[in-house]
Amino acid sequence: MSSKKFVKYFILLSVIFLGFHIIMWEICTKYVLADVLKVGDLARLSYSNDMVDDSHKDYSIDLPKHHIRSSFYNYRDQVDLITVGDSFSNGRAKAKNRYYQDYIATYSNINVLNIETTYNGRNAPLETVVYMLNSGLLDEIKPKFILIQSVERFTIQRFGKASLNIELNATKQQLKEFFREHPYSLYIPENNIINTGNYRALLYKILYQYQNDAYFSRIIKEDLTKKMFSVANSKKILINKDSILNIKKANQKSIKILNENLNILAQLLEKKGIKLYFMPAVDKFNLYRKYISNDNLPESSFFEMLREQKKDYIFIDTKKILSKKIDNGDIDVYYADDSHWSHKASNEIFSKVLFK
């Protein structure tokens, strides 16, 4: 091949390459990757620009009382309630009034401390409370209540596999330093116009037409029987595939282990005059399941089985509370583009569940 032909082919391929990336970026990818803080995780991972919820552009907090984050706590101010959980407890929804703890503080008129990162293990809230109990840190803080939160789909693997170890030990100073030095943080990738996401975006646009998970996506896309979200594609729902795959983990045996672990912790805390609350955050799939057109999908019985257990703790039944809300026609209880609930859900739950 002559040098002139090589140059021509090189220029042509470069134009095609750049043109593809510019076009895909402008019509799709920039809406889900340009500013990941303003896009929910489900839309971002599925490249569903028609499901992006503009609510993420509003980060305002207009509630009269706010919670305290553990990375800023001085261990002098009064704390009535301590919350320990996952991304739901750390405002991962990235929108207006994103912290449910602020609704607790406002409606119950109490001071709330959130432990942002669990100690000595990822997503280990039960163990973190045991460490705080055995170290004497709870004696120092003197809370009246502790709330353990976990998203439904990961609750069994966190709490329902083995008996809780109540002999865990750490010093108060170790815990204080850890909580101060480990604030909850998000990994924010930087994306330019030329990026591999443009290829995935085109591929997903095609494959989602034939398969609800585009054959290899982590996100499932299904039709709804009625409008549930105020986005361009308001009768579609995005679901985390884990929500479906993990349904079978909730059985009578695992639910019993989960309940026993919570009862053990509740009994230990009761000796200190502390009430334990447990709040599993209902999966988006479970909450909206009866409004999904596809009848071949499984159904979760996690909440139904847990309701039957004898409890020494207070169970916050988020499925029962939020199901009534969506059955009444409320939309955007969860964000269309995200796996987290909206401020509407937090308001609904904690206007009813009061800490007194």
Where are these regions (language model features)?
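Extracellular glycan-modifying ectodomains
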Residues: 1-356
